[in-house]
Amino acid sequence: MKNQLFIYNTLTGRKELFQSLYPKRVGLYVCGPTVYGDPHLGHARPAITFDILFRYLMHLNYKVRYVRNITDVGHLTSDSDLGEDKIARKARLEDLEPMEVVQHYLNLYHKTMDALNVLPPSIEPHASAHIIEQIQLIKEILEKGYAYESKGSVYFDVEKYNKKYNYGKLSGQNIADMLNTTRKLDGQEGKRNPIDFALWKKASSKHIMQWISPWSNGFPGWHLECTTMSRKYLGNLFDIHGGGMDLIFPHHECEIAQKVASTGYEGVKYWMHNNMVTVNGQKMGKSSNNFINLEQLFNGTNPLLIQSYNPMTVRFFILQSHYRNTIDFSNKALQASKKGLSRLLEANNNIKQLTAQTTNSTVNIEGLRNKSIEAMNDDLNTPIIISYLFEATRIVNSALAKQTQLTTEDIQQLKDFFQLFLFNLLGIKDELKYKNTSYNSFAKAVDLLLQIRVQAKQEKNWIFADKIRDELTVLGFEVKDTKNGFEWKLSK
């Protein structure tokens, strides 16, 4: 079977065969968070999406340099060139230093990403640590004639750029329409056109974060950092740039313009974008009173939640939808994910109970594996892989019920199948095992109690046997008598 990965390229609007620029090496850049608030579902989705890509590329034996930036300067409250810096505003409101705000929310972000079992990137550069490089990039764009200085700020000349290149190539935006529909706003009087975007902004005396530049004391525009840092760590040409669909315009469109203006070429071979998260059918946002951060999800403290959901349930919920589809959060959907994941983990843990009953296989685990690889190669189709995991679960349950006979090879292939797809590639952790380092001792203690119960039943000491079962039930254990003795599991 050919193992060829196809990914959807936003730039071309079609799935394309992935071919790395350099043999067995991949450069991957993903836009990370602006760290001024609690990490939420909108942060989890791109992190998990590109974690899956990172894991699979490594599985395919690529050496991956994965760069995910941290925005800690330049992202204004309007998401364009107006308003206050989001981090500076938070610092002012809470009477903190800006880097205190950054460190606090970055720690929270790392904590939640670790809980979601998101692998750390190879490099996690901060925008504020690359001011010199950003100033150098501005100089290059000015020298090429695609930017202009105005009142201490520097703006990218979109109209001039578009005469030679195509501004809007990634997003499908038409510059003529933008020029006709974009009104001139207060605070943009230094621009030649309202659609021009800032490369450098002159700071007011009250602006907390500002640096010395050839044009003024100020700060870089939001779009500049990713062009600068991707170039520094991955070179002028690299394989994949990822992020949320909300970044296609203007952020990623502006990144392309900056790269082309400074170097003459686009610099990225594949653009990948994950879709958005909605809550009960509505866009998530504080103004809609449907904002749920990840800590609230994990501890159940948001009023929209009827219970808490552990991080692996949240990860599994996100992976049940293809990354390019919108995913709608609801308690009903999370509860279904919790139940489904529990079935898969239980089946995996039950494989150890299986024994070979035949030498002639009646199941095709290798076929499931091949179809799952095909699904991964088809633009990371995780929902299809999950459907095959449920198919493997049915085989395990059928074998436990003595309705299907398995060979020794079948049993090993089932173990390998769950290990590769559920744990290695989808990144699920069996939380029952990892939550408590003394799990094995705990399980042995339960087994010992149930062995004592079996002995009590053999001695017809029914009251004592029932007491053990009833007490375990109260503690959250589900006990089932079998022909071979007993089975148990945690029911809550």
From Swiss-Prot:
Listed transmembrane segments: none
Binding residues for Zn(2+): C31, C226, H251, E255
Pfam families: DALR_2, tRNA-synt_1e
Cofactor(s) listed in the protein's UniProt record: Zn(2+)
Annotated EC: 6.1.1.16
InterPro entries for the chain: Cys-tRNA-ligase, Cys-tRNA-synt_Ia_DALR, Cys-tRNA/MSH_ligase, Rossmann-like_a/b/a_fold, tRNA-synt_1_cat_dom, tRNAsynth_Ia_anticodon-bd
Molecular function terms from GO: ATP binding; cysteine-tRNA ligase activity; zinc ion binding
Short sequence motif named 'HIGH' region, residue ranges: 33-43
Binding site for ATP: K286
Catalysed reactions, as listed in the record: tRNA(Cys) + L-cysteine + ATP = L-cysteinyl-tRNA(Cys) + AMP + diphosphate
Keywords assigned: Aminoacyl-tRNA synthetase, ATP-binding, Cytoplasm, Ligase, Metal-binding, Nucleotide-binding, Protein biosynthesis, Zinc
Record text on cofactor binding: Binds 1 zinc ion per subunit.
Motif 'KMSKS' region location, chain numbering: 283-287
Locations listed in the record: Cytoplasm
One Gene Ontology cellular component: cytosol
PANTHER family: CYSTEINE--TRNA LIGASE, CYTOPLASMIC, CYSTEINYL-TRNA SYNTHETASE
Subunit details: Monomer.
Official protein name in the record: Cysteine--tRNA ligase
Species annotation: Azobacteroides pseudotrichonymphae genomovar. CFP2
Record lineage: Bacteria, Pseudomonadati, Bacteroidota, Bacteroidia, Bacteroidales
